[in-house]
Regions:
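N-terminal amphipathic/hydrophobic targeting modules at extreme N-termini
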Residues: 17-24, 34-35, 41
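Terminal RNA-binding accessory module
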Residues: 54, 466-559
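Short glycine-enriched, charge-decorated loop/helix-capping segments at active-site entrances
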Residues: 152-153, 290-291, 330-333, 393-399, ...
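Conserved SAM/AdoMet-binding glycine-rich loop
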Residues: 179-182, 189-191, 310-433, 444
Length: 559
């Protein structure tokens, strides 16, 4: 059923909600600033325009609203989570509502994500909390609340954040009530936080990767500081002073998931199954900023996916720094292959994806489960990093070139239609031309569908940063260009293997450049463009692949 009504006035979007019997109309702004919301169903879906021009589905949970109604914000905050955060959500709502009424418009929030799928999923949670507080999500950074969820895997990511912070500082001078928050992996580095304290004093809030669930509480603290500043402005005996709130945890064993989420897509979703990493590859900062491995309980994961399916999700992406090591440390151990079998049993779920896999932990059992599955997508991201056994040892990857090649062959034999993708680093300290040729040899033998190629980035605090024989920049650039050409040439050949066949495609969006086309993904993660309209979004359809363009297909609906 299509919405017959979609009215946009002064940034307020009203929709008919088809899921409610009789067609009740709601104003999005009203929904977002009210302290209590009453619906006939436990979950009501309201479409709204959010970041990057995408359409998302905002899930309002009646149960959460009932909990919020019972909370007395004049009393002490609960100690248990997530009840403690519900308290601060309601407390922040009061301020946002009052400020919105004062300005005569809803307060807006913009979230920017740098980095991996884990960060993207974290950002959905952060934006969900902000919207539940009462902020309206927008695309541009001239918002009332700007949040950067940062990445620190490579130095360039840090530099991008610093550059954009300078622009935000200029905006904040014009709009003093604006709030700026920074979180994510970059904020776990002590020297980064110190630099921000000294150079970017206008930032309001800094927190890390371990306590993103505390956003409402931290925003509440910032708002209290803001009120104190305003009070000081009217007093001669006090000079207003901006206070930056910093709350970065070194590590945690706490997992808090039962909080609002603002999903980018209504039909697919990421699901965290574990956090942290125990591998300590010598070049990687992740274990230091994400902490040690900790797995979620299987029942919580299955319950979350079932709820997502009830809300219309047909595809999930199981997320973890190394999903293959899932289950270690649980009271009742369950390995990743066994978890996949349980997820497969969920009725209504059509597709299962996962990332990332570490080659040393990829078991025969997992390959067998993937081979017989009707739901696990035919795509496996298996980071290589280097084809040289000598360099792999220096990287602390704990496998050799020969072991990787044997594993890739085993996977392709068991699952002939699998799409293998990878990560490769060029210019690791001590890498010789011979080492680089070993990498090219693996690329030619495995014939990856695609590869993310990176120039080694020295990260302070990692063992590799202190290694001698750093490779000269011009040599690294030359190798990178040669590797990229090799990867692209092979990918163009491999990715065209399904031309003139019919494949099932999950339609994701109307094409940005050609609105008469829609764009979707095959099971093996290859992009397909074909004629269609927005009514196909979120549906699995059969598409005839007419032409291969090297890295994507052009097709038509197979009717």
């Amino acid at each position: 059923m299509k919405n017959p009504l979609k009215v946009k006035k002064k940034g307020i979007i009203c929709h008919e909600t088809p899921s409610i019997k009789g067609g009740v109309y709601y104003c999005e702004y009203f929904l977002k600033i009210c302290a209590s919301l009453i619906f006939r169903h436990a979950r009501v879906i309201v479409k709204s325009v959010i970041l990057c021009g995408k359409v998302t589905e905002r899930m309002y949970d009646e149960e959460l609203e009932k909990k919020l109604e019972k909370i007395d914000i004049n009393g002490p905050a609960p100690l248990e989570e997530p009840e403690r955060q519900y308290y601060f959500i309601k407390k922040c709502r009061k301020y946002v509502k009052e400020k919105s009424e004062e300005l005569g418009r809803p307060l807006t929030a913009c979230s920017r994500t740098f980095g991996c799928q884990m960060n993207a999923r974290d950002s959905e949670k952060l934006l969900g909390i902000l919207e539940t507080i009462g902020y309206q999500a927008v695309e541009t950074e001239d918002a009332d609340f700007v949040l950067y969820n940062t990445c620190t895997v490579r130095e360039n990511a840090n530099l991008r954040v610093y550059g954009r912070l300078g622009q935000l500082g200029a905006r904040k001078k014009k709009h003093p009530h604006m709030m700026i928050a920074l979180c994510g992996c970059m904020m776990q580095e002590k020297e980064v936080v110190e630099k921000i304290k000294k150079t970017y004093r206008f930032v309001d809030l800094i927190f890390g990767t371990h306590n993103i669930f505390k956003l409402a509480e931290l925003v509440s603290i910032c708002l209290e500081e803001r009120l104190e500043e305003l009070e000081a402005q009217g007093r001669e005996d006090k000079k207003p002073k901006h206070k930056m709130v910093v709350d970065v945890w070194k590590d945690t064993d706490q997992i808090v998931e039962d909080l609002p989420v603002e999903r980018k897509y209504s039909f697919k979703s990421g699901v965290n199954i574990m956090f942290g990493c125990n591998n300590f590859c010598s070049y990687c900062i992740v274990p230091y900023v994400r902490g040690r491995e900790r797995s979620r309980r299987p029942g919580e994961i299955i319950g979350e996916i079932k709820n997502l399916v009830e809300d219309g999700v047909v595809e999930v992406m199981l997320l973890g720094q190394n999903v293959n090591s899932y289950g270690k440390g649980l009271d009742e151990p369950l390995n990743f292959a066994e978890l996949l079998e349980e997820v497969e049993k969920i009725e209504g779920l059509e597709r299962i994806r996962f990332m990332t896999s570490h080659p040393k932990d990829l078991s025969d059992e997992l390959i067998e489960v993937m081979a017989k599955s009707k739901k696990i997508c035919r795509h496996l991201h298996l980071p290589l990093q280097s084809g040289s056994s000598r360099i792999l040892k220096a990287m602390n990857r704990r496998y050799t070139k020969e072991q990787y090649l044997a594993l890739a062959e085993k996977i392709k034999t068991a699952i002939p239609d699998i799409s293998l993708t990878t990560d490769i680093i060029v210019g690791f300290p001590g890498e010789t031309e011979e080492d680089f040729q070993e990498t090219l040899d693996v690329v030619r033998k495995v014939r990856f569908d695609s590869a993310f190629t990176f120039i080694y980035s020295k990260r302070t605090g990692t063992p590799a940063a202190a290694m001698e024989n750093q490779v000269p920049e011009d040599v690294v650039k030359n190798r990178f260009d040669r590797l990229l050409k090799e990867v692209q040439d092979i990918s163009a050949e491999v990715c065209g293997r399904d031309v003139h066949t019919v494949q099932t495609v999950l339609v994701e969006e109307v094409n940005d450049h050609s609105p008469e086309l829609v764009t979707g993904r095959m099971s093996n993660n290859t992009i397909v463009h074909f004629p269609g309209d927005a009514s196909l979004i979120g549906k699995l359809v059969d598409v005839y692949l007419e032409e291969s363009k090297g890295f994507y297909y052009m097709g038509r609906l197979n009717q």
